[in-house]
Each structure stands twice: as C-alpha cells, then as structure tokens.
C-alpha cells in the first residue's frame, strides 16, 4: 500500500438499482447520497443500473430518469464527486453532456471486456467535458489477462485515466484478479490508475478487492450492504472494516457506513441481496449478475428453475446486453423438458 489513500467509489445508487428493479425514489437517493457523503466516500455513482438511458423494455424501466436521480444526489453532496455509468450503444455523448450539466463529474465508460474499441468516442468526449474519465471492462473473466490488458491499453489511448477490472459475473477468485492486474500494470502508463469492481456471488467480493489493492489497484467499487446485481457488490462497510484492520488509508467513517447500510439500504430490498442458490449459480456459471431478476421472472412465467436458466446462459456465454435472450433460453428449456 505504501501509505497511499484508497479511492472509495460507492455504487449503491447505480449497481444497487438492479437489486430493486431500478425503483429508488428521489428521497431514497437524497438520503443515501447524503449518508455516503457524510461518511466521506470519494465518489457516488448514480444512474439506472444499466447506465445512462438504460431505462427501457429490455433492461427495465426506472422510477425516475437518470437526470432526476443525478440532480437529487448532487443537491445534497458537499464532498464526494457524483459519478455515472455509460454503456456505448445504450447511452450517447448527448446523454453524457446532460449528465454533466446535472452534476456528474466522473464517468465510467463500460464495454464488454473484448469490445473496448466502441468506447473511443465517448471517452474522448468525456475528456473534452473535463470529466474524470474511467474505462470499465465488464465481464473481465471472459478473456485472458493478456487480452484484457490490450483492451485496457486501447481505452488508455482514447484518453481514459483509470481502467477497471470488472467482475460482472462475480466469477473470479483472488488468483484471477492478481493475474489481470499484473497484466494491466505491465502495459499501462505508470500514471494511469486502475480500479476493481467486484461482485459477491462466490462470497469473494471483499477478498478480491483486497487482492487488487495488493497488486497496486487505486480505486475500489463497493456498495452499502452490498446493494447490487446478483449477490451484490463488495459490501462497502465490510471492505472498510477489513482494510482498516490492515492499516490501509481509506478516509471513510466505518460506523456511519454501517448505520447507512442497515438503516437506509437493507430495508429497501424486496429480494435479499445475498449468496443463495440463484446468485451462487451466477458466479459459478459466470453469468452477468444483472440477469438475476430477469431470470427469476422468466422461471416463474414458464414453470422452470432459475438456476437451470442461469446455467444454460453460462454455457452459451451470454453477456451484458443480451437480456432478451433469457426468454429464448427459457422457452428452449421448456420445450426440451
């Protein structure tokens, strides 16, 4: 660690959207953002779970627009930067400009781990706006460390000043994480930061985040009570407690985070965010974590097991953006019964 302070990036108000089908009220956003700001996290990501303009038939309609959510958070935050997420092909540079005007100052431009080349326009425009611009390589378990490093190098070339290893499926272990960070560090400029976005489907969210920091990672994503897709993200309050015991600098108020997790976030969950039969299947099969709620809906509709659908999606190597295939897979399974 060398005494450097970790950059704590909260994702409760973006990844956490998946856990409640994108239904945060504006008051929920204000309360959670204020609590996070009071606890001194560095950034607070706000958007539909699938990023700017994710509200749709394919991904699920949000209770509010991205801009309403961003403005609500920006109104109450004094210390943290407001971040947002953009997936090229869902959000556009026009949406990014609107988010910036609403108060977002950090953007994470997210692509599948082998498709960094679709991010060039969005990364370049974010830099022109003066935003803290991050490349976000989703489903990082689906390619080799060496190939991931090549994709990271592309994003760096477009102008991203931080590149994330993103374990969208919660499918990686600590060795997988170490291998990927070592590969990235070998090719990126020394001044380019790296980040880790974990999911907890194998209960390794905190352990993987710690392994990332040990490999030189600068920024860590986490969420209150792990509020996120699948079994959730690395639980923020647990990560802070664990690294505090290691003597690492994080700048956050542990007890304030513990209170916010239990008092503000956990009561909102209509389905517990935890490792259980279905979310463990996500991590084991290496499936995009936000498929969980869609699979459970399809399983109920067609009289199937959600686990069977998830395992089949994993076999077919489905990735984020292919939510429409969940029903196709469910119908195939039903017809083959």
Swiss-Prot record:
Residues at the site labelled Transition state stabilizer: 14
The reaction(s) this protein catalyses: (S)-4-hydroxy-2-oxopentanoate = acetaldehyde + pyruvate
Pathway(s) served: Aromatic compound metabolism; 3-phenylpropanoate degradation
Keyword Manganese: yes
Binding site for Mn(2+): 15, 197, 199
Chain ranges of the Pyruvate carboxyltransferase domain: 6-258
GO biological process: 3-phenylpropionate catabolic process; L-leucine biosynthetic process
Subunit description: Interacts with MhpF.
Family as reported in the entry's similarity comment: Belongs to the 4-hydroxy-2-oxovalerate aldolase family.
Identification of the protein by name: 4-hydroxy-2-oxovalerate aldolase
Origin species: Escherichia coli O157:H7
């Amino acid at each position: 660690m060398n005494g450097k302070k970790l950059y704590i990036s909260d994702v409760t108000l973006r990844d956490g959207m998946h856990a409640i089908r994108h239904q945060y009220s504006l008051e929920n956003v204000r309360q959670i953002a204020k609590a996070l700001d009071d606890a001194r996290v560095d950034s607070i990501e706000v958007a539909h779970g699938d990023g700017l303009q994710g509200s749709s038939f394919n991904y699920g309609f949000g209770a509010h627009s991205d801009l309403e959510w961003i403005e609500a958070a920006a109104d109450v935050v004094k210390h943290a930067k407001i971040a947002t997420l953009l997936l090229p092909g869902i959000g556009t540079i026009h949406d990014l400009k609107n988010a910036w005007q609403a108060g977002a100052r950090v953007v994470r431009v997210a692509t599948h781990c082998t498709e960094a080349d679709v991010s060039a326009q969005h990364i370049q425009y974010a830099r022109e706006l003066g935003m803290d611009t991050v490349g976000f390589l989703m489903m990082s378990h689906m390619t080799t460390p060496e190939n991931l490093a090549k994709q990271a190098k592309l994003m760096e070339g477009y102008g991203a000043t931080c590149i994330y290893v993103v374990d969208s499926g919660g499918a990686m272990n600590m060795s997988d994480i170490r291998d990927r960070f070592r590969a990235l560090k070998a090719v990126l400029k020394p001044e380019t930061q790296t980040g880790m976005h974990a999911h907890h489907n194998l209960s390794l969210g905190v352990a993987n985040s710690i392994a990332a920091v040990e490999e030189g990672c600068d920024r860590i994503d986490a969420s209150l009570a792990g509020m996120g897709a699948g079994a959730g993200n690395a639980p923020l309050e647990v990560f802070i407690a664990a690294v505090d015991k290691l003597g690492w600098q994080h700048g956050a108020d542990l007890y304030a985070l513990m209170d916010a997790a239990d008092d503000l976030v956990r009561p909102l969950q209509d389905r517990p965010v935890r490792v259980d039969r279905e979310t463990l299947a996500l991590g084991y099969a290496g499936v995009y974590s936000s498929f969980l709620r869609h699979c459970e809906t399809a399983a109920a509709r067609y009289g199937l097991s959600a686990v069977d659908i998830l395992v089949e999606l994993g076999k077919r190597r489905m990735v984020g953006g292919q939510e429409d295939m969940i029903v196709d897979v469910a119908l195939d399974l039903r017809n083959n019964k």
